[in-house]
Amino acid sequence: MTRPILIAGYGSIGRRHLRNLRALGYKNFILYHTGKSILPDDEILDIPTEHNLAKALAHKPVATIITNPTALHMSVALAAAKAGSHLFLEKPISHTMDGVEDLRRLAKRKKLIVQVGFQFRFHPLLRKIKRLLEENKIGPIVSVQAHWGEYLPDWHKGEDYHLSYSAREELGGGVLLTLCHPFDYMRWLIGEIDSVSAVQSRSGGLKIDVEDSADVLLNFKSGAIGNVHLDYIERPSRHFIHIIGQNGIIHWDNSKPKNFDRNRLFIDEMRHFISCITKSEQPLCSLNDGIATLRIVLTAKQSVKEERLIKLI
């Protein structure tokens, strides 16, 4: 690829993707950021930087890696797609459905690759679980539970978590959006979801203006039922999935095993994205997948407000 790759947003995940692309051998980048990041600039001194999106897109990037706050994703994605740039869109794809269908139509018309950053689809054990389920090793699925609790102030050492997008409603924060991975990998593993019921809490302990815990009940179209628990409170952190089938169970715990680097997931998803562009492959996690997960989250939020079970549209 001779055209540059645009990194739109230079927070912690933008820096990770930049490092990983460099590790994969790519050297031609453009950086678009507002200058509000508190990360040091030493790694980007050699990268042309624009503070205006139109100027950044004037460099004609072959791909745009969208890593700015959730509430700003869609405006950048639409502009980049109009410019003919393939998209790697961090999760969640947005905080509302505004502009989402426009992006879907635009990407289809321009034949653009759009991959969504749900990196757990690249976890070797979750991929093994998917194979086991496809082989019907535990029979029909009866119930599935996912639990993800992680203390928000510990996420990025040296940063004020109050200022992060995860903690701010206007930037698309809160556990339902920020920790939405289980909704994606449950769809991927178990199948489509029919209806959602949710409750949430703003406990006040973290002094943030978004929900810091939530529980979501899911009815799958297959007849299976599920539960997702998310929180910003739990210490030590815990993340697992427990699947009950008619003939057995599967339990996966995300506690770090020996000799496993979680950055492998991010390397593999970025390698896959580049391969999709250069070899015309289809993304393992497509824009349609990202839209489906966003609908689940927004339906959960609606359920909280209306205090009832709601069918997905």
Model-derived features: positions:
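Hydrophobic residues in well-ordered beta-strands that form the structural core
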Residues: 89-90, 114-116, 252
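Contiguous beta-strand/loop segments that form the cofactor/metal-binding neighborhood of enzyme cores
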Residues: 177-256, 267-280
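N-terminal Rossmann-like dinucleotide-binding module
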Residues: 1-44, 59
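Beta-loop-alpha module in the N-terminal Rossmann-like domain of NAD(P)-dependent dehydrogenases
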Residues: 47-106
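Rossmann-fold dehydrogenase core element
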Residues: 102-120, 140-144
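A short helix->loop->beta-strand "cap" motif at the edges of active sites that frequently abuts
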Residues: 26-27, 83-85, 110-113, 224
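Predominantly a Rossmann-like dinucleotide-binding segment in NAD(P)-dependent oxidoreductases
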Residues: 120-207, 307
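C-terminal helix-rich "cap/oligomerization" subdomain common to oxidoreductases
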Residues: 63-66, 135, 221, 275-313
